[in-house]
Swiss-Prot record:
Widely expressed in the adult nervous tissue, especially in the forebrain, including the cerebral cortex, hippocampus and thalamus. Belongs to the eutherian X-chromosome-specific Armcx family. PROSITE patterns: ARM_REPEAT. Residues 51-62, 72-81 have a biased composition (Basic and acidic residues). Interacts with MIRO1. Regulates mitochondrial transport during axon regeneration. Increases the proportion of motile mitochondria by recruiting stationary mitochondria into the motile pool. Enhances mitochondria movement and neurite growth in both adult axons and embryonic neurons. Promotes neuronal survival and axon regeneration after nerve injury. May link mitochondria to the Trak1-kinesin motor complex via its interaction with Miro1. ARM repeats lie at residues 198-238, 240-279, 361-401, 418-456. It comes from Mus musculus (Mouse). Induction: After axonal injury. Residues 37-106, 139-186 are annotated as: Disordered. This is Armadillo repeat-containing X-linked protein 1. GO terms for cellular component: mitochondrial outer membrane.
């Protein structure tokens, strides 16, 4: 029985050694292929420790095997041992050991000491962040590590996922990630509810309904409600009977007060509503109070914007008659600068506005004495389309007629070389440009050119 016991001790030692080697393997090399993102320093340290541990394990195993090889073989049916080695949740690995007798003693104590040493090394590595294999694919941050971007400070944002997976502890903790992963609150105000406007924007309203809309517009500060109310009033102002009703209800000051708002959409809708109201001559008497303010805002707002176009349309309507043109004479240089700088649509609308002034002979002296950019002459080039050419030719024709009718040709010394008078009358460049347009391919432009040339 003594030799059987010794053989059993040898078998137990080999089983324990094999199990320890398997544990070391699982702790060091048995990693998931999907989780190979490690820091370079940690990899170097782990490789050195794993190498030393594996060398030591091999030496111990050779010692045990050498000692067992000196004994006599026993009956296989008695000495054959089957052991399941592996993690508790992992798949079992069957080891079959054929122990042999040996003459030495104390193998059981040596096996226990070896197992204890390997176990301590495994615990030490686990404490430094070595991971045990997990069946679950879910990874959570350990409580000892700061969450990326959280209060504990900071992992690099580009490596958040890899650092979080590599820094998990041996036990899988079923906890949520830090609060920093939650979506941050938006800095922009969110509209809590929609205002139910009592009418549709294209409804034709009666006087009581218009009064309700004006009351809403006067009391609200909500941009959405203001926009809907202004569009509703602007659409109704397209009808002559409602133009009078809005004026009689005191709607012009209520609408015009929104000219001062900073919201460009609200200003655009305000100008559109006033533009429709300005078709009525009595309404123009109410709107003239705000015409200078509209002109200033139109000149300083963003070039070619919708607000600028709406302002130019309102100014054009307000200058169709001669009653309020003198209120805008101080802005003549700005109009010509806008005529040169603006895009196609801004140019056309500005020309229509200036043509209104040229049709009033009383405004001729102020108009031709203002300073204009010399590049304005480029508007007479053939490259422009029919509408721009017809408008610039009309502008030149009206100014030339007014200079003759007002007798300003004899007082040419009053005007500077940078004035519109010098550009159109004295330089002779305009006349050359107009003569060059006589060969234009557009028949309408040709007819207009011939008409202008006959008046020179």
């Amino acid at each position: 029985m003594g030799r059987t016991r010794e053989a059993g001790c040898v078998a137990a030692g080999m089983v324990i050694g094999a199990g320890a080697c398997y544990c070391v393997y699982r702790l060091t090399w048995g990693k998931d292929e999907n989780e190979k993102l490690w820091d370079e320093e940690e990899e170097e340290e782990e490789e050195e420790e794993e190498k030393s541990c594996s060398d030591k394990t091999e030496k111990e195993l050779k010692t045990n095997v050498g000692v067992g090889a000196r004994g006599k073989p026993q009956d296989d049916s008695k000495s054959k041992v089957e052991v399941n080695v592996g993690p508790e949740n992992g798949p079992g690995v069957k080891k079959e050991v054929h122990p042999e007798s040996q003459s030495g003693g104390g193998l059981e104590a040596k096996a226990k000491a070896l197992f204890k040493t390997l176990k301590e090394q495994a615990r030490a590595k686990a404490g430094r962040g070595i991971r045990l294999p997990n069946i679950s694919r879910n990874r959570t941050l350990t409580s000892s590590l700061p969450c990326p971007g959280g209060r504990g400070g900071g992992c690099h944002p580009g490596r958040t996922g890899s650092r979080a997976r590599n820094r998990t502890s041996g036990k899988v903790k079923r906890k949520n990630r830090s609060k920093s992963n939650k979506a941050p609150a938006t800095a922009w105000p969110v509209r809590k509810g929609k205002f139910s406007f009592p009418y549709k924007i294209d409804d034709i309203l009666s006087a009581p309904d218009l009064q309700k809309v004006l009351n809403i517009l006067e009391r609200t500060n909500d941009p959405f409600t203001q926009e809907v109310a202004l569009v509703t009033l602007g659409n109704n102002a397209a009808y002559s009977f409602n133009q009078n009703a809005i004026r009689e209800l005191g709607g012009v000051p209520i609408i015009a007060k929104l000219i001062k708002t900073r919201d460009p959409i609200i200003r655009e809708k305000t100008y559109n509503a006033l533009n429709n109201l300005s078709v009525n001559s009595e309404n123009q008497g109410k709107i003239k109070t705000y015409i200078s303010q509209v002109c200033d805002d139109t000149m300083v707002c963003r070039l070619d914007s919708a607000v600028q176009m709406a302002g130019l349309r309102l100014l054009t309507n307000m200058t169709v008659t001669n009653h309020y043109q003198h209120l805008l004479s101080y802005s003549f240089p700005d109009f010509f600068a806008l005529l040169f700088l603006g895009n196609h649509f801004t140019k056309i609308q500005t020309m229509k506005l200036i043509i209104n002034f040229t049709e009033n002979p009383a405004m001729t002296r102020e108009l031709v004495s203002c300073k204009v950019p010399s590049e304005l002459i480029s508007l007479f080039n053939k490259e422009w389309d029919r509408e721009i050419l017809l408008n610039i030719l009309t502008l030149f024709e009206n100014i030339n007629d007014n200079i003759k009718s007002e007798g300003l040709a004899s007082s040419r010394k009053e005007f500077s070389r940078s004035s519109l008078f010098f550009l159109f009358k004295e330089s002779g460049v305009c006349v050359k440009k107009i003569k060059a347009l006589a060969s234009h391919k557009d028949l309408v432009v040709k007819v207009k050119v011939l008409k202008v040339l006959t008046k020179l």
